[in-house]
Structure formats: structure tokens, C-alpha cells
Amino acid sequence: HVARRTAGRDVHVCVGPSRDELEVLIDKADVVVDAIFGTGFRGNLRAPFSIWIPAVNECADCVVSIDVPSGLNAETGVVDDDCIRAERTVTMIAPKIGLYSADGPEYAGDLVCGNLYDRLDEGIDDVDHAAEIVEPGDLGDYFAPLPTNIDKYSRGSVLIVAGSAQYP
């Protein structure tokens, strides 16, 4: 199926390469797109993935991962064995918690959230979120300029209680 769709284009399809074959292909590539596993990956790497992932990490100049770097648990951010070290990760629909947790930031590189369809926001607002990303722009109204003569007791205090049943 992939071979038919890429016929006549400068795309090479190689199924099940050895480490040596993969290193030759990586050496010829400007960019390596990592789409080995998806968001459901958990546990330890098995052959041939335990051979390919180190080869990509050692030989590729530029790696872009799709959704999450292969080898990373998308829910926890934990890497059990090895994981693709991406320069950039393009995650779909919404950022995954694992990209921001545990080992995730070390392996994900720059994060880009790609939309899969135009009316994404309408559907995603109806879904219970496990977490929400707070960015600097979200805090502007909370941190209005203060008078120069203010002291620490004039603005109140903060108590944060956080956690969940899923991530105690």
C-alpha cells in the first residue's frame, strides 16, 4: 500500500532493515521521521526496535517524532529502556502528559501541537481533561502591575493542593 502511493517519488520503503542497512539509510536522509510506536506504547523495547532506536539516536542529525517519541510512555513520561531523542515532536489533537512529565522533556525536543481537523476545538471542549497546560499568556490578568510601595501581606496568600487518583 505505501509502496504504491509513493511510486515515482523520492521515497524509499525498506521493511525490517538490519542495523547496518538502517544506518546507511539514515546517513542519506535529511530528516528522520519517527512513527514507530504511538501513544499506546508501554514497557520494554524488543527486537528489532531495541536495535533501530539506538541506531537512529546515534546516526540521525534531525529526528521529528509523531505524537510521542517512540519508547516514551505517553501517560507517564517514563522511558524503560531507550527512546528516540527527537529534535521536535508533532503531537496530534492535544499535548500528552508524558511529554511534560518524568523523562518526557528530555526526549521530546521542541513541541508542536498539530490539528487533525478544523473543528477540533468544538469536540475537545466536551472532553474531561487529565491536565491543562498553563502558559505565560494565560496568567497576564492575574499579575497586573503592582504599586511600588506594596508589601507581601497586601496581596493575600496562596495554597495549592494538587494531585489526582490517577497520578497520586
How would you label these PLM feature ranges?
Residues 1-124:
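Glycine-rich phosphate/dinucleotide-binding loop and adjoining beta-alpha-beta core of small-molecule
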Residues 1, 99-168:
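Small-residue (G/A/S/T)-rich helix-start motifs and N-terminal tracts that mark the onset
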